[in-house]
């Protein structure tokens, strides 16, 4: 059997690939990519479990989530792993990209590796946005309303994108169905496709390692070889995965995932808050309102993402050592501080200002009873003064009904008989 498989499967080539040496100067930060992959698989496994009991309709979604949390064996634990695992994945992917920036690992010939990594970050954020609506509680509904409204501010295609996301004029059953399809079908296929391409480039070009403080050691130059990927790096990655899983399991056990009341589209007083990794965008809306709103909702995020994608082509400094790249160091530091600062401010800031309900005018405040009420006053032989109409309970009762012509005629006959 061994010879049969050996002749038909590239086991020798695969073994040689696993034993390919890594750079000599490597540390635990190089396990972040493996941890991100582990979290993606964990999200797929826990999501598949939750999908067995979930129903993507406004009538059943909230009840299904409640049933999972309260009735399904280990349901609350699995839901906790899925929920907190999503946050952990955002953190790990962000730290992984930050490590690549600090070590200059995006430089030639690894430009495509970087681009596919940034695209993966966008997909991870897409998972968070589409999955947020699925519980169909107040927080999920109104945060999605804000998110779709932000998308609608994009020039040219904004209204089209918002309409496609909603599936109509308002968020409802079609919206929930589309978000569920994106979250469970489209984005997973896209994510695993990008991961496959990203891993291919990582293994093809190898890791750049830690840049050394010598002008000769550039990312494009040959790197001093160290220990093989298997078993040394594999062992470190597995240990990191186990530690991460234990941490997530503890959080899932002791920190229940919140679930608010079922979504009420008429509750316009609700203060919508996105998930924490979107709070920096939420806070930007506080500084750019009215005609300037598009700067916070579209211009800054789009420009930032384009610059991130094109970073390998914009950074022409051949040196990889961080302190010899002052521009990259400054831009990275300012960006990280800005994102973290805006996130903290967004978590503690008051709700966005909304347009106040129209206040009564002088004309509406002094409006006299309708024609039917005036006729009723004559029939029942009473006359309310303007002050009584404005301030008494009798005036409120008068305004709370509308007499028909038959009722007025009947009341007149009663009055004449008396």
Describe each region flagged by the PLM.
Residues 1-283, 287, 295-363, 368-371:
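Membrane-embedded alpha-helical bundles that constitute the cytochrome b-like, heme-associated redox core
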Residues 291:
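Alpha/beta-hydrolase-fold serine-hydrolase catalytic core, especially in secreted/extracellular enzymes
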Residues 351-418:
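Membrane-interface segments at or immediately adjacent to transmembrane helices
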């Amino acid at each position: 059997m061994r010879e049969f498989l050996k002749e038909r499967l590239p086991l020798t080539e695969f073994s040689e690939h696993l034993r390919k040496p890594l750079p000599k100067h490597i540390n635990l930060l190089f396990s972040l990519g493996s941890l991100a992959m582990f979290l993606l698989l964990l999200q797929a496994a826990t999501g598949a479990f939750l999908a067995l009991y979930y129903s993507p309709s406004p009538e059943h979604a909230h009840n299904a989530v409640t049933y999972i949390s309260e009735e399904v064996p280990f349901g609350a634990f699995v839901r906790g792993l899925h929920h907190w695992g999503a946050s952990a994945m955002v953190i790990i992917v962000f730290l992984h990209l930050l490590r690549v920036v600090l070590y200059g690992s995006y430089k030639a010939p690894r430009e495509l590796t970087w681009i596919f990594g940034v695209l993966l970050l966008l997909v991870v954020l897409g998972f968070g946005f589409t999955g947020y609506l699925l519980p169909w509680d107040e927080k999920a509904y109104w945060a999605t309303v804000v998110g779709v409204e932000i998308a609608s501010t994009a020039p040219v295609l904004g209204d089209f994108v918002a309409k496609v996301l909603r599936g109509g004029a308002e968020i409802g059953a079609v919206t929930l169905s589309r978000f569920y399809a994106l979250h469970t079908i489209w984005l997973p296929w896209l994510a695993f496709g990008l991961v496959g391409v990203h891993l291919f480039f990582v293994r093809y070009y190898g890791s750049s390692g830690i840049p050394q403080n010598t002008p000769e050691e550039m990312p494009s130059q040959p790197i001093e070889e160290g220990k093989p990927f298997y078993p040394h790096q594999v062992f470190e990655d597995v240990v990191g995965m186990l530690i991460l899983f234990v941490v997530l399991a503890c959080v899932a056990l002791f920190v229940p995932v919140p679930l608010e009341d079922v979504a009420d589209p008429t509750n316009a007083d609700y203060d919508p808050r996105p998930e924490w990794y979107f709070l920096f965008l939420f806070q930007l809306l506080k500084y750019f309102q009215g005609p300037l709103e598009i700067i916070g909702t579209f211009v800054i995020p789009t420009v930032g993402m384009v610059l991130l994608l094109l970073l390998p082509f914009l950074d022409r400094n051949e040196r990889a050592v961080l302190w010899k790249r002052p521009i990259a160091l400054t831009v990275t530091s300012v960006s990280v501080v800005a994102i973290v600062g805006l996130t903290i401010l967004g978590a503690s800031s008051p709700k966005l200002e909304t347009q106040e309900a129209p206040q009564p005018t002088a004309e509406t405040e002094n409006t006299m009873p309708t024609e039917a009420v005036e006729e009723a006053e004559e029939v029942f032989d009473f006359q309310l003064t303007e002050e009584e109409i404005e301030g008494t309970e009798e005036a409120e009762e008068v305004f709370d009904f509308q007499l028909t012509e038959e009722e007025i005629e009947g009341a007149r006959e009663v009055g004449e008989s008396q």
